[in-house]
Amino acid sequence: MATTITRHTKRGSVPRVSAVFFLFFAWFAIAAATAYSQSPQKPVIAPDLAARLAKYKPVKMPFDSSHLSDREKQMVAKLVDAAGLLDCIFWRQSDPEGLKLYVSLADSKNPQDQMLRELLKINGGRFDQIDDEKPFVGTDPMPPGRGFFLPHETRANLEQQISRGRFEKSAVYSPYTIEKICAIGTDAEYYGPCFDPYHAAFGDFLNPMAEDLREAAALSDDPAFAKFLLLRADALLSDDYYPSDLAWMDLENPKFDVVFAPYEVYLDGLLGVKTSYGASIMIRNDAESQKLAMFQKYVPELEESLPLPPEDLPSERGKHQPMEVVDAIYRAGDLLHGYQAVADNLPNDPRIHVEKGSKKIFWKNFLDARVNFVILPLAEHLMPPEQAKMVTGEGTLDFVVLHEISHGLGPTYVHGSKRGIGEAIGPQYSALEEAKADITGMMCVKWLVDHGAIPKEKLNEIYASFLGDGFRTIRFGIAEAHGAAAMMEISYLSERGAIHRDPSTEFYAVDFQKMPAAMASLAKELLEQEATGDRARTENWFKKYAVMPPELAAALAKGSDIPVDVDPDFDFHPPVR
């Protein structure tokens, strides 16, 4: 049920509200009008669309269905249809006005319009992810609350409305609500800001989406996967993902798998709690998946090795850590737009972590593209030749695997409470968690080397691959969570002498002797920030370290011909509306 301001203003009657309260509504109305005042048909467009698009490498992601049965092909088609509907919701969360413009350009044959449309698709809206979210359409800055909140909403105003009893805190901070103007009351006798649950706000898309999942379940030859799809269909219509997340964790080496839920909070720059919908339809790579089995058995010992007191480590946590190497057949939502993930650790629900653990997914087709088209060329450009050749796809995969494992390690809640770490830290949480996973993951690499699980001679290869990947990530800018995390890490490690720049060659190199101690020190700091939930400490830390030095910016600029990311081109193109 939506929560809202509780004053009544019957339609057709004189509003009985105070002047202050009237101004509150007027403020929202004016803000909304301002946000929507610019016609999507005649926007001011950045003149350098071609240059912006050139920063992305188009990569075909073909799907070989020749080995599938007819039923499997039909099942995949149903899942793609569902993902297309999910993408429509994501656009409304990310940039509703950008969606209008994107749809309006669909039939245009104008090359400029098609370039603009592609850039809108890449970014999921009008704001350039690798230019600190500055607009390339119009001049209005990106609202920190995106489409989750009313235009010009602020954290201070929301907290004030909560304290006055006009909003329920649980609704404001729910991962599955969106702020809108609602008709409220038994007879819809008044209007006002409210927080509507996703399943109500997006029902026009979620209902047919759930039906597609049910039809896909009927076509599946895997009973466990079919059961999961049915439970996930129910979850889409209730916003209760717990039962289906449990079923997802119980899947054993499925041939097909999906990510299909609002999981990540990267888009919410206002509160850092609203989840955006994302989807990936995947087919398992058995040979590569079997190679990861070694890592799974060490997870409990890796957790125990963390530099935290026992009271800040989970007393109970499911240690089930399934790992799947897959190829993406199709992706949608926050897995299609923006930063192209090569791995994920899901679900994010701490209750699932306690009861079951978490699943690590590695998209091989995306990792191969990232390494070949971005990381290796960038390493050759920024690192001395003897270290650049140490950057490898295998070293990058090891780093990525331990990164994802480390998302599931460390504090589950703020020390001494059941308060979520994300709620406590706020918008900076996404960057903090990405940095924690990076650095704790590298600590885990050292532990595995020390205990003979990884050959000693591999350690420096993984350190070099870590730096090569870090250079790739900071090109997204510090407004993006992964970019902010990587910039902070490089700054701190440079301060500790573990990374150093040679001014004569302008190359950046790893000091392999200093790296372990510097990594351990940084891991301790980041884990303590999560354990304490100290928002000011985290904000000040990133304010100090997530700053691009001019000399690094200049070095990156010289490599402008190297793509920043890949732009996947799938065999499927469901319509967006």
Provide a role label for each language-model segment.
Residues S18-A32:
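Bacterial N-terminal signal peptides
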Residues A31-S39:
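Signal peptide processing junction and immediate N-terminal pro/mature segment
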Residues S39-R126, I130:
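N-terminal mature-domain "stem" immediately C-terminal to a signal peptide or N-terminal signal-anchor/transmembrane
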